[in-house]
């Protein structure tokens, strides 16, 4: 009440915001071979800010690291998710090398070999570390590393010329 005997009242609504429960789930394995990807999905709010700068609810990850997201709900309250570790495994170095000329006459051959890896799948069906092609064709190898990752080598073209008749 003031000096004139007047009084006033004000209604105030207090909103007690509750922090959202920020969670991250992976849409696949978080350890994968080079060239792979995993989608990380955020939940618990209406807006999202990932530690890599993305502002979408879901992110597609191809690089290793720890990923977390700040989630904000409709009341403007925020919370940070736990970190999700993404590991990217190195693919083997897949190089096929010809040890000799790749163009030769019928009856000849050339050794094509690779190194590294633990298993090999050549385009001609061989599973050895090296092959000795005697027919024309394009040869490459899929190498599997100790970590299970694969890589395809360069292609080597072999040309076998017929022996001329007299």
Give residue spans per PLM region.
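Proline- and Ser/Thr-rich low-complexity, intrinsically disordered segments
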Residues: 1-166
């Amino acid at each position: 009440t003031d000096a004139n005997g007047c009084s006033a009242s004000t209604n105030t609504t207090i909103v007690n915001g509750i922090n959202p429960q920020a969670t991250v789930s992976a849409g696949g394995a978080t350890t994968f071979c080079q060239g792979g990807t995993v989608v990380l999905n955020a939940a618990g709010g209406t807006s999202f800010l990932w530690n890599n700068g993305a502002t979408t609810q879901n992110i597609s990850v191809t690089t290793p690291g720890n990923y977390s997201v700040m989630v904000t709900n409709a009341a403007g309250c925020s919370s940070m998710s736990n970190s999700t570790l993404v590991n990217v495994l190195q693919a083997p170095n897949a190089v096929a090398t010809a040890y000799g000329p790749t163009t030769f006459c019928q009856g000849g051959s050339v050794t094509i070999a690779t190194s590294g890896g633990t298993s090999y799948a050549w385009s001609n069906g061989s599973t050895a570390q090296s092959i000795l092609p005697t027919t024309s064709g394009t040869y490459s190898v899929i190498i599997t590393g100790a970590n299970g990752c694969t890589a395809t080598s360069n292609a080597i073209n072999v040309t076998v010329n017929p022996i001329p008749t007299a």
